[in-house]
Amino acid sequence: MPTFSLWLPAGSNNVHPCGDPYAHHLFMRCLYHAKHDPTMKFDVKTTNVNKTSQEFKNTGLRRMPGISAEESGETQTFETEDDILDFLEYLKPERGDDEEAENATCDLFRQFARFVKDVEHRDTAFNTELLRLDKYLSEQETKFLISDDVTHIDCLVLTRLHSIRVAAKMLKNYEIPADLSHVLDYLKAGYATEMFRVSCPSDQEIVLHWTELKDTPRLSAKDRAKLVREEPVFSFSV
């Protein structure tokens, strides 16, 4: 079993991870695998993307997120999304049958991005995807997507869904409808999970991430500075 470091872009304080849901997903995935394999050893490191540390440069990685792994005295690096996810797929436990769950969630993030970027001015398509997820969850007899325990796909969907929830409220004054009770119960189950909470960025970092993307609503310099100065908030209740 290799020892590895997960490198993530630092957030506004140059210490804690940024609010990118992909970074949150990878952090949670690593915690998930570590929970199931006590021999697995990894750490999480951050650095400013605009002024990377010498330690990061020494790994040979050129971008983040990335993984630097040590095995038998040799160092390997993984920095494309496909390479990182392929590396994680070799870790225990094996992936379960999550094809139906993938089908129920595959368009949710894309439709939210279209909504928040005003490609879609109405929330209709986004709501349709949330309803699709709610229907899928209503037909399951499990706390999570395919099991009563977190699996690979939950690490992806929960982190995205939380990012969506926080950003939608701040940037579009949108809240997940109360009648989508299965989606809200799913989020509650995620929020009660230690690996989710440990890996989760603050609400402020999530908002900063979204407002720095192309075509998304921008914050004024004053509002951005206010967010950075605030005590970190973690919205773990719905």
Swiss-Prot record:
Entry keywords, A to Z: Chloride, Chloride channel, Cytoplasm, Golgi apparatus, Ion channel, Ion transport, Lysosome, Membrane, Transport, Voltage-gated channel
InterPro entries hit by this protein: Glutathione-S-Trfase_C_sf
Compartments reported by the entry: Cytoplasm; Membrane; Lysosome membrane; Golgi apparatus membrane
Comment text on domains: Members of this family may change from a globular, soluble state to a state where the N-terminal domain is inserted into the membrane and functions as a chloride channel. A conformation change of the N-terminal domain is thought to expose hydrophobic surfaces that trigger membrane insertion.
Top-rank lineage group of the source organism: Eukaryota
Primary subcellular site in the record, as a coarse category: cytoplasm
Designated name of the protein: Chloride intracellular channel exl-1
Source organism: Caenorhabditis elegans
Function: Probable chloride channel.
Coiled-coil ranges (or none): none
Ion transport as UniProt keyword: yes
Tissue: Expressed in the intestine, neurons and muscles.
GO molecular function annotation: chloride channel activity
